[in-house]
Amino acid sequence: MSLRFVIGRAGSGKSTLCLHEVQEELKQRPRGETILYLVPEQMTFQTQQALIGSEDVRGSIRAQVFSFSRLAWKVLQEVGGASRLHIDEAGVHMLLRKIVESRKDGLSVFQKAAEQNGFFEHLGSMIAEFKRYNVTPSNVYEMWQQLDAHSSSAEQKLLANKVYDLQLLYDDFERALIGKYLDSEDYLQLLVEKLPQSEYVKGAEVYIDGFHSFSPQELEIVRQLMICGARVTITLTIDEKTLAQPVNELDLFYETTLTYEKIKQVAREEKIEIEKTIPLMEQPRFHSPALAHLEMHYEARPNEKFHGEASVTIHTAANLRAEVEGVAREIRRLVAEENYRYRDIAVLLRNGESYYDVMRTLFTDYNIPHFIDEKRPMSHHPLVECIRSALEIISGNWRYDAVFRCVKTELLYPLDVRKETMREEMDEFENYCLAYGVQGKRWTSEDPWMYRRYRSLDDTNGMITDSEREMEEKINRLRDVVRTPVIRMQKRLKRAGTVMQMCEAVYLFLEELDVPKKLEALRIRAEESGDFLFATDHEQVWEEVMSLLDTFVEMLGEEKMSLSMFTDVMSTGLEALQFANIPPSLDQVLIANIDRSRLSNVKATFVIGVNEGVIPAAPMDEGMLSDEERDVLSAAGIELAPTTRQTLLEEQFVMYQMVTRATEKLYISCPLADEEGKTLLASSFIKKIKRMFPDVIDTFITNDVNDLSRSEQISYVATPEVTLSYVMQQLQTWKRYGFEGNLDFWWDVYNFYVTSDEWKQKSSRVLSSLFYRNRAQKLSTAVSRDLYGDKIKGSVSRMELFNRCAYAHFAQHGLSLRERDIFKLDAPDIGELFHAALKRIADRLLRENRTWADLSIKECEHLSAVVIEEIAPLLQRQILLSSNRHFYLKQKLQQIIFRTSIILREHAKSSGFVPVDLEVPFGMGGTGSLPPMEFSLPNGVKMEVVGRIDRVDKAEDENGTFLRIIDYKSSSKALDLTEVYYGLALQMLTYLDVVTSNAHTWMKKGGTASPAGVLYFHIHNPIVEVKGDASEAEIEKEILKKFKMKGLVLGDADVVRLMDNKLSTGSSDIISAGLKKDGSFSARSSIASEQEFNVLQKYVHHTFENIGKDITEGVIDIAPYKKGNKAACTFCNFKSVCQFDESLEDNQFRTLKDMKDSEAMEKIREEVGGE
């Protein structure tokens, strides 16, 4: 029994010496005593290859490469102890979830924290850390007693409570495992106990290579190996000079020196002979003087400089993508020009979550075979999502999001139906569910679902059409596809008495969906497309899910569990599932994390993402215990994993290892921006390397080849996939700026694409963007007639839409596009309710021959309640009756109608104008409809402007009959003559023209009528500010002012007084007008003369004619208006269709000048030739 150390700096040949000794021993005595070669888990594959890579050693039974966990398996299989069921990380998280749920009421700190994402991962890591450091539940309990007895501050009490919670959960966890299960850490503890009984290990020659430190648990294994084995050889990365000096925590080899001393202490305790240490002083790894210099002088202060040509390269990249592309280009150059193999190259990084997806895509495009050494979660695989969302459907009462997350896994689709067909149908089905607000009991009810196209309050009694019936049948068929398997599982879960039966329900759910066959089809499809990584994913995920169900049953099978807890525990287990890494092929670039990698035989290393806060790492206080709390526990005698401060001290050693892996070339790079364009800073580590190699030039990597010389651009010609974008850059620059000279070799590259059979079609689609102009071509006469017909019938809103943006009009009325219908109460729905409610009250008053002035306050309240109750079941598929929230909203809407009724009552008392009709149709056909506004366009097309007028009021005096238009609005609005001029506000003047033009046929007494004005009535329930001692009358007066109607009224004092008979002088509380003492109008009055009203009406006709002409002649310009802070695009539903982009040459707003009303009126006169 002896111990031997082999020490030396990085690259000194420690592993080579050990492997050579083993190989020589195998050549001399192939059947001798066991040789154990222990390495970290991530080194086992490459070490096994190196061991049998010698020509003289093609295989061996005597020598085996192990990690600690693999050695545990080997020993336990030999001496017993492996009969207990192994639970993996997912099983641990599930068990912890169950323990926490059952203990929740007794927890102090973790009761709420348990609901946070990642809690069980942190808790599992904490318990694993306890085990690795030989901390038992009783140790934690004793620590809690000590802390509880001496805690006075809030921080101390928090730590005491946290330790108490940890002790409870750790103890429950250990009790659940006793005699039944083993987790990963338990194997190492069992290994310590069983090693003395192992004949396989007894007398073995043991090599321990590649470790820098050992946990207390691992140190105990080393102790037993020294006791049981013949000799233990341990390699450590230490400079021999360090051992002759006092240990300093700032020393580069501080961690490995401590490990050296700990192992020697163990050997002394066990009276193990300590052989003479073998120090290795040479640097056989490095074939480059520069890399040898970097290793030898890495920690020197001040930095030792290396002059001359160096094999160290520093790059700064414009962004992360440019950085990765630069790496890819250099890898291809090394392989093509310097005879490198891909396996000779490694890429090291730390923030893999930012890089892996980009690297996977770009390395594939550059045809670089690669292996990413990462653990990928299974949480996004369709199978995992299907199980999780199906359980959420059941436990969450069939919420929309859970249902369609399950649908979109496509595992609910019947096996014999084309996926493409099902996707289209399910999209339609989802639209239906969104429009009808389907959730909850509607999914489980046997009542068939109905489909009707109507949404209007006036269109509720239509007969079902054939197309509606066909759609209804499809919807019910798709409903059964979705709900049937889930309902079957739901029933089984409710009947289940134990966890075993609940797991069986999940298994049967998957089997009845033919999931294994569907996954096999996905695997075959992935293989056919050459994506072998994802092909194996589909195999792995089924095996892992089945293993998870088995583990669940083994651990908790006979227990009873609520459905919600079962869902939570299952979800916790599913979140922990990870894809196993498939060993790399013989010739791939290895992409690995700096902290986990243990590289060997690498000629070139690319260290990427060397940004501040990443390399070296910024301090991060994460996990269950903070650094301060760990320090408290450490002071009390509980040793745990290093604190953030200790980890930061070890960063220098990590970076030293990072830059000493390669034998020939080292590349260091950093991006200046991330994928979102946020600025990143270069690491101070790059400055250190620059000081060591002052002759090395920091080169800049860009995505834009136009920034490079022609000689530099040639390196950007790589594979057809990636080069196409650079050809585009060159051609765009040439086209836009017409630079002097020619495109040199880029024309040759261009010719390759346009002549290649494989790339001709692909490249033409991309290259066509060179000539892309986001312009909508004018429709031909034939197309225009097909879309709009020979007779156009449109509302005023449609005409206004055309003037806002011709393309938006084309999208809505030509292509008939519309937004997805969502089951929610929008502004148009509320507006429709307000109109309907006020019309019903007014109709009732007309039938009773009463006016608004006749109503009492109580009647206003009663009528508002009655009409809202009548309308609620008719509005938007009964949305106001669908939930408590909407019921509350219904009450608020009733209050608004009540308040509006009171105001209309006050207006009626103060006005000579009375409503003569509401919701007056024109051009709609049928009894009571006024004629449309008709136009014969120059191209022969007939156009009718139609609509419905909210309210028409009439007043009479000795001067004749006057008519005014009242338009109800759910937001404040005024008539802007500038908008009238630009054709953006034509509605009110159109309505006024229709009623006055048709007065002789419309009014019961016949005759003519003059325009009195157009006014907007804002329906709302305002809040007013008043003094604390204000009376109720004063408050009501202030509220009345908030309802002042804005618009444009006839500039006739008598007519204005008809509108407000309380007005003598001053401003009216009812309309936007006021009178001075001399009888003239105040400056702020919104008035127009009768002649001006006539001019405005002529202008409306003129504008409609122009609009009609443009529509029928196919004008669909993408030319939205912009006026001040208003723009057509702000609330447009078609932005994703037109792709309007101000950065494009052809896409600019039509900027409309804001004008005073007088200026706008003058321009209107000019247009129509008015006086």
UniProtKB/Swiss-Prot annotation:
PROSITE patterns: UVRD_HELICASE_ATP_BIND, UVRD_HELICASE_CTER. Its cofactor is Mg(2+); [4Fe-4S] cluster. It is an enzyme of class 3 (hydrolase). Residues 281-587 form the UvrD-like helicase C-terminal domain. GO terms for biological process: double-strand break repair via homologous recombination. Keywords: 4Fe-4S, ATP-binding, DNA damage, DNA repair, DNA-binding, Exonuclease, Helicase, Hydrolase, Iron, Iron-sulfur, Metal-binding, Nuclease, Nucleotide-binding. [4Fe-4S] cluster binds at residues 805, 1129, 1132, 1138. The heterodimer acts as both an ATP-dependent DNA helicase and an ATP-dependent, dual-direction single-stranded exonuclease. Recognizes the chi site generating a DNA molecule suitable for the initiation of homologous recombination. The AddB subunit has 5' -> 3' nuclease activity but not helicase activity. Heterodimer of AddA and AddB. Belongs to the helicase family. AddB/RexB type 1 subfamily. Despite having conserved helicase domains, this subunit does not have helicase activity. This is ATP-dependent helicase/deoxyribonuclease subunit B. It comes from Bacillus cereus (strain AH820). The gene is addB.
